From Swiss-Prot:
Gene: rimP
Disulfide bond residue pairs: none
Stated name of the protein: Ribosome maturation factor RimP
NCBIfam families to which the protein is assigned, alphabetical: PRK00092.2-2
Lineage of the species this protein comes from: Bacteria, Bacillati, Actinomycetota, Actinomycetes, Propionibacteriales
Function of the molecule: Required for maturation of 30S ribosomal subunits.
Signal peptide residues on this chain, from the entry's feature table: none
Coiled-coil residues: none
Main location class: cytoplasm
Amino acid sequence: MSSANQDATRGQIEAELDDPLRALGLDIEAVEITPAGKRRILRVAVDKDGGVTLDEVAEATREVNRVLDGSEVMGEQPYTLEVTSRGVDRPLTLPRHWRRNAGRLVKVAFADGRAATGRILDSNEEQVTLDVGGTRQQVAYAEVKKALVQVEFNRPTDGPGDDGDDGGDDEAGEA
């Protein structure tokens, strides 16, 4: 399949899946088609505010299967479907990505060559506010060349995005 055909197919898939997945409260973050021998792999990444659960990914998988089974968009060649969450390895490219990662640590490469690592404090449609070394910095998205969420094993629990749940049992247990 040529690159132009593949782009058209991705666009058609996204158009067919957009409304059914929005009905589940999910946004399509990426559609990828990769050749794998005589088959293709169709990967659909979904997300929503607060992140997606495994049950929501399973429900999205069933819905994508239902829609594609009733469509000709994938043609006759067999394919394997993978529905996933967005994942932390994908760059933050849209305002909703910044909003959904409030409280997380990000590494930002700026268009002018500078770089910074800071925590997302707030964001809107035009800019993000970061805490960089204790200093609040407002950054317009237009200034950002690339931004990636950093994986933290000991993430602070008193910042934005913290729900206050430490994962422990709030009820007293019996001995």
